[in-house]
Regions:
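Flexible glycine/proline-enriched surface loops and loop-helix/loop-strand junctions
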Residues: 7-12, 70-78, 137-139, 147-154, ...
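Conserved catalytic neighborhood of penicillin-recognizing serine enzymes
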Residues: 101-166, 215, 228-257
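Sec-exported extracytoplasmic/periplasmic mature domains
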Residues: 27, 31-35, 54, 95-102, ...
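Non-catalytic, structured segments within soluble enzyme domains
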Residues: 1-17, 171, 176-177, 187-191
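A penicillin-recognizing enzyme superfamily signal
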Residues: 16-36, 46-48, 59, 66-79, ...
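Mid-domain, small-residue-enriched loop/turn segments at the edges of structured enzyme/sensor domains
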Residues: 127-130, 162-204
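Active-site SXXK
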Residues: 26, 54, 81-116, 145, ...
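Non-catalytic structural connector segments
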Residues: 1-15, 23-24, 28-34, 39-40, ...
Length: 262
């Protein structure tokens, strides 16, 4: 579609970014050869990207798929899912650091950095908000709150940033912020989205954190060659700065902690 070509009728050589080793490894996971799934009902969609370029290196389209014209669970716009807590760096802490000069320690209160309090709290329109384990942990840094995926500090971080800034931040990362007349529902701070996202969108958005704040539009085909004429069309990378390198560094540092203490 991108090149306006009907691939079934035009002789082409198509050069993709597929990394055979990574794709074979992912296939073994999806097929249950190198990972034990609980049952055959559980589905999965996986995208493996080169964070520096946006090249799609491997795709896990789903499990137990046979036949043709099957939906690709990794990239389909028809089967998007709510991102849950993976939305917190995108909607909450990333914008707080980028626009409100927060640090990994705490939020900026007129030049003084303060800890968030993980305690009883409610959404602006009234309903109480809880953590996944039903407990409260008191004062904590942004680093600890994100590493432990606490909901209440995440909502408080979201509430401190102007909606227009969050919309800009998320949009620059290729995610539809689902704004309503310029405003956002507070539930998106915890990943409760109406339309949802797919793994391709999330992989590309997160890649910007490890790429100095630069977002690369993901792509799978690097070049096509018309066999009849030898004419080539090469992909032109789409790259933009989505956030400062300082914000990207701090979020990446916190996410590193998730693998250790989260």
């Amino acid at each position: 579609d991108k090149y306006g070509i009907i691939a079934y009728t035009v002789p082409l050589l198509v050069y993709t970014n597929l990394d055979r080793e990574k794709q074979d490894g992912l296939n073994r996971v999806m097929n249950g050869e190198s990972y034990t799934w609980v049952n055959d009902v559980i589905q999965s969609g996986v995208t493996v990207l080169d964070s520096q370029t946006g090249k799609i290196l491997a795709i896990g389209a789903g499990r137990n798929k046979t036949g043709v014209n099957q939906l690709n669970l990794a990239t389909s716009d028809e089967i998007k899912r709510q991102p849950g807590s993976t939305a917190k760096p995108l909607f909450d802490y990333g914008p707080l650091i980028e626009y409100n000069n927060a640090s990994t320690y705490g939020y900026n209160d007129n030049g003084e950095y303060r800890l968030f309090v993980d305690g009883p709290y409610s959404y602006t329109n009234g309903p109480a908000i809880n953590n996944w384990d039903g407990t409260f942990m008191g004062e904590m840094s942004i680093r600890r709150a994100l590493a432990l995926s606490r909901n209440i500090p995440a909502l408080k971080a979201f509430q401190q940033v102007d909606d227009e800034n969050i919309i800009e931040f998320v949009s620059n990362l290729g995610i539809d912020p689902e704004e309503h007349s310029g405003s956002l529902y507070e539930s998106v701070s915890l990943g409760a989205m109406e339309g949802g996202v797919n793994s391709l969108q999330m992989a590309a958005a997160y890649a910007a954190f490890s790429n100095g704040g630069y977002y690369n539009e993901p792509y799978s085909v690097s070049k096509i060659v018309y066999r009849d004429t030898g004419e080539e069309e090469t992909h032109k990378e789409v790259k933009r700065q989505a956030m400062s390198d300082a914000t990207a560094y701090m979020i990446t540092s916190i996410l590193d902690d998730v693998t250790v203490t989260g």
